[in-house]
């Protein structure tokens, strides 16, 4: 599957209005992970590879639910990526940062390049997570969260767990070969 099709999965997420009934404890553990998802994935492959699909400033093309969770500034930094483990796509993610964050701690997000967001986010003090919601795309799981950085700056992160992700493997925390 091409990165364009993988990233398009983010647009098809059906967000759940109620907390989900988890199929098992492993799924719940993955979806409610409060630490770095990058670190959790790297336990299964050693090193995550990031492929950027789209990155740059956008205006007015964000979804209504995204706008409701971020300050009304009209301009946002958008980063859409696919994370690969063992050369297989495991997770696709979208990060939105208000343009006003260019002057604060979030300015480093604008220059991450191929560095995983989680590697930067959890390097020092973990961000506060004040909103989290779960969703589905067919049989795939997704989550979105508003994170607050050190000065309270918001960052919106949406993640969809792709079919080859260790989440879906029986015993989802056993390292893969």
Swiss-Prot record:
One of its GO terms (cellular component) is cytosol. Substrate binds at residues 37, 79, 117, 159. One of its GO terms (biological process) is pyruvate biosynthetic process. InterPro entries: Chorismate--pyruvate_lyase, Chorismate_lyase_/UTRA_dom_sf. It comes from the Bacteria. One of its GO terms (molecular function) is chorismate lyase activity. Pathway: Cofactor biosynthesis; ubiquinone biosynthesis. It is found in: Cytoplasm. Keywords: Cytoplasm, Lyase, Pyruvate, Ubiquinone biosynthesis. Pfam families: Chor_lyase. It is an enzyme of class 4 (lyase). Its EC number is 4.1.3.40. It catalyses: chorismate = 4-hydroxybenzoate + pyruvate. Monomer. Removes the pyruvyl group from chorismate, with concomitant aromatization of the ring, to provide 4-hydroxybenzoate (4HB) for the ubiquinone pathway. Belongs to the UbiC family. This is Chorismate pyruvate-lyase. It comes from Sodalis glossinidius (strain morsitans). The lineage of its organism: Bacteria, Pseudomonadati, Pseudomonadota, Gammaproteobacteria, Enterobacterales. The gene is ubiC.
